[in-house]
Amino acid sequence: MKSYKIGIIGLGYVGFPLACLFAKKYPTVGYDPYQERVVRLSEGVDVTNEISTEVIQARLSTHLRCTANPNELRDCNVYIVAVPTPIDLYQQPDLTALREASSTVGSLLKQGDIVIYESTVYPGVTEEVCVPILEQTAGLTFNRDFYVGYSPERINPGDKQHTVENICKITSGSTPEIAREIDALYNSVLTGGTYLASSIKVAEAAKVIENAQRDVNIAFMNEIAKIFNILDIDTNAVIDAASSKWNFLPFRPGLVGGHCIGVDPYYLIQKAKLHGVSPRLMMEARKTNDSMGGYIAYQIINQLCLRGLPVKDSRVLLLGFTFKENCPDTRNTKVIDIYRTLQHFTDNITVYDPFANAERVAEEYGLTLTTEPAQLPTDNDVVVLCVPHQCILQTDVYQYLKPEGIIYDVKGKLPLSERIYRL
């Protein structure tokens, strides 16, 4: 039986849980170019909160080693690339990290090695972008000297129920034999099983439509929420009623941020445009979802006016800043759109999030984040429950309000009252 030594490139939300998973059975080297990240992991601290200290220490004491030195990957025979694939300022795919990772792996490749990509991309990237870099850097021939596969990540940050170990993973390979080998490798560490796709492009396409479909469905609900707000109908009550039908899909309106659903559709949109197709539904869904932060802010202003509360220089408390609940990730958070729109009316805005890193928020978004509840003002005109972290839901939100103040509940998590408004 073939013995494997696994190299994981990228130790973020995707790569590190994957490294811990493979290290249960195989010698595994986790590589990340950021020394600070490697140091914290080696100390047993995962700042993404995906893996517990106990699990990290258990893996480090057996098969796992973390490093910022790519040369320590040299003895590996399977390389798994799990680096970010964001978009640029023009909403175009940014493959910089993927190209750099491919170049790093290419400098290490040996005869018979396998390179597996997990990063979300448009169909064709693995074979048309990554493989040429591997060939050129390694001086080896694709599908003769080395092979590639694609197994798209399905990490849901903050979700302790659906983990990398117990969800079904799509696998694929550059030859039928390699595809079966990659599938067997993943199956050897997963409890949720695998789905062997017929080609790498099929696997790439499957991943990108998973997130694009969710984006479209949420956009529909956001549009519905805007309509029902005008008609003075409770959107969540409508969804609850409609959910009594067996095949109704109970998506909820809200903010769509983060590094997956709010980003990945642009990869398929760009690929479609290159081939002369204008994917209007996906593009409109993106516009709708990207508009929701500003829309919510103006809904808040409207409610302040209707209640006779001050708008100019009003005191506002935003609860939650990360892109989703129970997760420290602030990348592409749409709470910033609420904040910046409200800034046109008042400078008295406090932003609270116990999960987020205050220094990173200040550096990326230029705002001061409060992480301690004891520091929060209690005389706010409006409290906006932006991100319903469990710890926030367990507190009395009313304690932060003036007697006549209002609450805007973005995701509809609080019981309705005459002082609560929501999408």
Residue ranges and their predicted role:
Residues 1-423:
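Structural/interface elements that position substrates and couple domains in central-metabolism enzymes
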